[in-house]
């Protein structure tokens, strides 16, 4: 009978050890997956080029001599444009002027409304980079404001 109790103790010890190893493995795997999802080298590299400056409004970042605001709310293209002006009278939806600027904005997140941009090579109003976007600017999306650009009326894009 004593041997039978020892067998249960050994079995319980193996189960507990197996559970501990499983928990450690799962926690390690989750950390690796989280790191891959959150830590993207291209974002880290481009964010280093963006920083907060005293001459930019509060909660705006400076990039390429522009003050940029990334919205957290969703609006149509026209509403986003109006919201930019409400945030700062000298702002509008950002006009992307260089491939590096486009890369920087894409590395942060896609699906933002932006103003007209020759770099996007769009031929008609309301063209988009994002998947499943409407072609008339009525889909509610986040938007990017800038204090140094003035997009033309009725031209909208998302990145």
From Swiss-Prot:
Keyword terms, alphabetized: Early protein, Host membrane, Lectin, Membrane, Signal-anchor, Transmembrane, Transmembrane helix
Extracellular side: 31-159
One function term, GO molecular function aspect: carbohydrate binding
SUPFAM superfamilies: C-type lectin-like
GO biological process: positive regulation of natural killer cell mediated cytotoxicity; stimulatory C-type lectin receptor signaling pathway
Major location category of this protein: host cell
Gene3D superfamilies referenced in this protein's UniProt entry, alphabetically: Mannose-Binding Protein A, subunit A
Annotated TM spans: 10-30
Pfam family, any one: Lectin_C
Cytoplasmic side: 1-9
Cell compartment(s), UniProt: Host membrane
Gene Ontology CC terms: host cell membrane; membrane
Bilayer disposition of the protein: Single-pass type II membrane protein
Annotated C-type lectin domain residues: 63-159
Family: Belongs to the poxviridae A40 protein family.
Name of this protein: Protein A40
Biological classification of the source: Viruses, Varidnaviria, Bamfordvirae, Nucleocytoviricota, Pokkesviricetes
């Amino acid at each position: 009978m004593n041997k039978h109790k020892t067998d249960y103790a050994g079995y319980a010890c193996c189960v507990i050890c197996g559970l501990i190893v499983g928990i450690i493995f799962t926690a390690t795997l989750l950390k690796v997956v989280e790191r891959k999802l959150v830590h993207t080298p291209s974002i880290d590299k481009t964010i280093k080029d963006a920083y907060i400056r005293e001459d930019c409004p509060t909660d705006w970042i400076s990039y390429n001599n522009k003050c940029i605001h990334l919205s957290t709310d969703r609006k149509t293209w026209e509403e986003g444009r109006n919201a930019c002006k409400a945030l700062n009278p000298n702002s509008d939806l950002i006009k992307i002027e260089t491939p590096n600027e486009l890369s920087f904005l894409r590395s942060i997140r896609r699906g933002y409304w932006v103003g007209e941009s020759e770099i996007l090579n769009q031929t008609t109003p309301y063209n988009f980079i994002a998947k499943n976007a409407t072609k008339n600017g009525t889909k509610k999306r986040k938007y990017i404001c800038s204090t140094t650009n003035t997009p033309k009326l009725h031209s909208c894009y998302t990145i």
